[in-house]
């Protein structure tokens, strides 16, 4: 689950021996947006920080953009929401410019003219917003003679994010404000890691969006159990399995019941599974996920996401998206040194390892008056490939749900919102649900929502409408 696109926050202030000082001086501009049919005035502030090592040598920069509504009499009671995606190697651009932020950037590719408009579903009317890009993404960068490696691992990254949040709250006189933190994809790992050390924050809500919450199923039969319901809805959507008049939710739930019942029991038997039972399970799987029973048997009933998305529409010369199984594209040319997930048609990476957004760069320079000429990096696999994973876990993302349980036990009013998409095979919907179900959380303060979307759960106009409704309720409860 390493290549999970999304968004990030960071600033290494809390890490021992790490100091931060301004690079580009903070820039504040004043704006008005129409949100929910009302005019909302707000200040936008871009801030870049230099991260230094224990000896004081500058290593890299972290940058963030804050949107603060003006005209508020008592800011101590107004919520502030910090949002980040993941990757690792993803900027905050998806949540910033496609979901929560006051402006939408609707064209992303290099060479395209900016297409920017107000976001009528922005959260700026109900909460102040802070979007931060980690080292190597957005306008953030590794400095000459420095290194991003201290911030390109689970622990260093989380310390950097938590340090940024503390510094921002203190600098802006908001330590008493209700704090909400939203992490998407690997951002869920980041959020779960850092809340274990966030007792000093006035945390009100944790928002996990298509989160990678750890390695509960990684390398085990649980991987296949988690993926099967998402494969079932993908097969129906792609015309390879029948819905029988059922809703997406009903298709998912029927497949979930089978996956966690007969299917899981069959996998547990391993090579001791009788042939007759194997064939019965394979036939049921075939009806659910649209692959031939023979193919399923050849894989010992264990069909992973990559096998599924390549096989589902192979007769048409198409591969199905990983981040969004509703998206298809012609089978790409085989590149032995390139991860299959990098060729995901729902990712839009093309032959490069980097997505540059000219539109976002132009917005930052022209509207927010940011005096930076370098490109805005929306996503870079170069950071992803350099990420250091805990070797004690075989190079996998750690399981961090105990941190969430600890935080919720320490803060009796802290609530959690989990949002996922039915069409997400990068983080199948069942995986984070299972992780939270087994974290011994106070479930009366936990809400789990499934949307008819892919990995970017709030993408598109309908996604933003659903997002605004969910977030308005969650933040104001």
Language model features: what each stretch is:
Residues 173-185:
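Alpha/beta-hydrolase fold nucleophile elbow
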Residues 56-150:
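N-terminal cap/lid subdomain of alpha/beta-hydrolase-fold enzymes
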Residues 105-106, 195, 199-289:
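A catalytic-pocket lid/entrance helix-loop region that shapes and gates access to the active site
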Residues 25-71:
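N-terminal cap/lid segment of alpha/beta-hydrolase-fold proteins
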Residues 183-195:
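Glycine-rich nucleophile elbow surrounding the catalytic serine of serine-hydrolase chemistry
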Residues 5-14:
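Bacterial N-terminal signal peptides
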Residues 209-210, 216-226, 291-476:
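C-terminal subdomain of alpha/beta-hydrolase-fold enzymes, centered on the catalytic histidine
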Residues 124, 134, 151-169:
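Alpha/beta-hydrolase active-site loop
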């Amino acid at each position: 689950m390493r290549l999970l696109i999304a968004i990030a926050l960071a600033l290494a202030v809390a890490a021992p021996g790490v100091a931060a000082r301004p690079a580009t001086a903070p820039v504040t501009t004043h704006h008005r947006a129409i949100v929910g049919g009302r005019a909302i005035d707000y200040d936008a502030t871009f801030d870049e920080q230099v991260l230094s090592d224990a000896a004081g040598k500058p290593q890299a920069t972290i940058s963030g953009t804050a949107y603060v509504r003006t005209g508020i009499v008592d800011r101590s009671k107004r919520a502030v929401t910090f949002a980040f995606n993941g990757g690792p190697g993803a900027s905050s651009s998806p949540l910033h410019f496609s979901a929560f932020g006051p402006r939408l950037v609707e064209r992303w590719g290099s060479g395209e003219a900016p297409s920017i408009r107000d976001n009528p579903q922005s959260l700026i009317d109900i909460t102040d917003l802070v979007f931060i890009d980690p080292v190597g993404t957005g306008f953030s960068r590794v400095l000459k003679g420095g290194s991003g490696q201290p911030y390109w691992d689970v622990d260093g990254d989380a310390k950097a994010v938590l340090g940024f949040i503390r510094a921002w709250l203190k600098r802006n006189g908001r330590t008493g404000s209700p704090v909400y933190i939203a992490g998407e994809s690997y951002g869920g790992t980041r959020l779960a890691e850092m809340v274990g050390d966030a007792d000093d924050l006035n945390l009100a809500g944790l928002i996990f969006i298509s989160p990678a919450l750890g390695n509960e199923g990684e390398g085990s039969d649980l991987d296949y159990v988690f993926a099967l319901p998402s494969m079932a809805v993908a097969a129906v959507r792609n015309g390879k399995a029948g819905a029988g008049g059922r809703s997406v939710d009903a298709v998912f739930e029927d497949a979930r019941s089978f996956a966690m019942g007969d299917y899981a029991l069959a996998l547990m038997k391993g090579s001791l599974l009788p042939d007759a039972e194997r064939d019965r399970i394979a036939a049921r799987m075939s009806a659910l996920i649209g692959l031939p029973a023979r193919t399923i048997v050849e894989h010992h009933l264990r069909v992973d996401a990559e096998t599924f998305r390549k096989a589902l529409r192979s007769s048409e010369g198409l591969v199905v998206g990983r981040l969004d199984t509703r998206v298809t594209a012609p089978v790409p040319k085989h590149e032995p040194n390139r991860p299959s997930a990098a060729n995901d048609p729902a990712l839009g990476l093309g032959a490069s390892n980097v997505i540059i957004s000219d539109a976002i760069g132009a917005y930052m320079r022209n509207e927010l008056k940011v005096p930076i000429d370098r490109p805005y990096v929306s996503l870079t696999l170069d950071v992803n490939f350099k990420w250091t994973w805990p070797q004690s876990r075989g190079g996998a993302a750690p399981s961090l749900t105990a941190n969430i349980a600890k935080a919720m036990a320490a803060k009796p009013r802290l609530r959690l919102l989990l949002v996922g998409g039915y069409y997400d095979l990068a983080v199948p919907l069942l995986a984070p649900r299972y992780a939270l179900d087994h974290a011994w959380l106070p479930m009366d303060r936990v809400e789990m929502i499934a949307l008819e979307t892919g990995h970017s759960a709030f993408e598109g106009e309908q996604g933003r409408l659903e997002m605004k409704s969910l977030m308005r309720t969650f933040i104001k409860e």
